[in-house]
Amino acid sequence: MSNSNQQAQIVIPSSVLGQITALAMTETPLECCGFLVGDFGSDIAQEFHPCRNTAQSKIIYTVDPKDHLRIERDAEERGLAIIGVLHSHTHTEPYPSPTDVAQAPDPAWHYVIIGLKRAEPETRSYRIIDGEISESQIVSA
């Protein structure tokens, strides 16, 4: 059992955070989405890969399956893996919605949400395991 005083974390380089913010600002008012790639089982995001939101919605996102497959294959060919998924909340807090929780496919992934509700974008990360949400600290490298 993990130490409850130690919060989980994900390391996201400032350049990657900049890419995420730029995508979210470009796509608003629609939600944006993409994948974080790093070493398998790692909590260090080395890359961000934007995906098309096939839902074309202000309130939900659906990753284009072709983008997902392309990014996953490319990562695997280079000995890397998808370690997290990113999407934006354009008008709400950066906290997982019931839909986000219900559709969380991998308990090992980080679920990163950038909120655009306020003047300054706010990026937060979570783990979603068996419907339970726990926040992870984002460490900018």
Question: What kind of feature is each model-predicted range?
Answer:
Residues 1-82, 91-141:
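Conserved beta-strand-loop surface patch within small alpha/beta domains used
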Residues 85:
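Conserved, mostly hydrophobic/aromatic
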Residues 88:
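Metallo-beta-lactamase
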